[in-house]
Amino acid sequence: MSKVTVVGAGNVGATCANVLAFNEVADEVVMLDVKEGVSEGKAMDMMQTAQLLGFDTTVTGCTNDYEKTANSDVVVITSGIPRKPGMTREELIGVNAGIVKSVAQNILKYSPNAILVVISNPMDTMTYLSLKSLGLPKNRIIGMGGALDSSRFKYFLSQALGCNANEVEGMVIGGHGDTTMIPLARLATYKGIPVSKLLSAEKLQEVVASTMVGGATLTKLLGTSAWYAPGAAGAYVVESIIHNQKKMVPCSVYLEGEYGESDLCIGVPVILGKNGIEKIVELELTAEEKELFAKSAVAVHKTNEALKEVGAL
């Protein structure tokens, strides 16, 4: 019997749980939220689609009852608040760090062997906080960001090529932010053909730019953060772990010298399997890509410093 818990039954968490159920990734999915009745109601709503959609996964909800999350194989953390107008980066980190730290500690009381998938923002920093505050092996703490950014990159590539997104390969590394992510256009392919041979340099740069502001574009259109793709990206990461698929997925993981960086969590390609991070894959980067990655790492380190400023670490 496999079990996944999703903490936070908001838009992203509920979407993640729904995708996990629909794809029958686990036998049981538990949603936990602090708001009375929300996770229970959404779980019931999802279960009423089981006959319509043909899935056998059991989805349940609970209000702050961590005992019901016991013996989870993977736990997805989506908890936290969005940045409000006038709120500084440090204030957002201060609030969300407290929430994520508390959630992670409570989860481990009942699921000491769980693998954690962090979606809460700022994602690289919350992944780093979870790792440092819990003292778990680094293979068990994974930030989802690169999976989402890469999916957005493939979407924009497919739009430019006029093809199906499933026929495109593309990868985004670096920090999960609109100035820190690095879409690797050089390595993108369509049916094995380098995209650089199919699109002009100008068009490819447009795709890269659109990818980098992908989240902000959706926030502007929706009036809030996106949820379908982030939730699905979280479920995609979980599926590779639960089913031991050994997929190569860019995720935010703790580096100890890889890519010339240490003591931070940042997006790089990893092999995901039953142990979480099975392997960090080191790509041969160009001088320009190395420079961009180093700049991205500096920005992530700077955000991590705020954890000390607010007393979270």
Residue ranges and their predicted role:
Residues L134-R140, D149-L313:
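C-terminal substrate-binding/catalytic lobe of Rossmann-fold NAD(P)-dependent dehydrogenases
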Residues M1-V4:
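Extreme N-terminal starter segment of soluble prokaryotic enzymes
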Residues A9-G10:
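Glycine-rich Rossmann-fold phosphate-binding loop(s) that bind the pyrophosphate
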Residues L52-A114:
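Rossmann-like NAD(P)-binding element
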Residues L32-S72, H301-V310:
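Conserved N-terminal Rossmann-fold NAD(P) cofactor-binding segment
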Residues T88-K154:
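Rossmann-like NAD(P)(H) cofactor-binding subdomain of soluble oxidoreductases
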Residues G13-A14:
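N-terminal Rossmann-fold NAD(P) dinucleotide-binding loop
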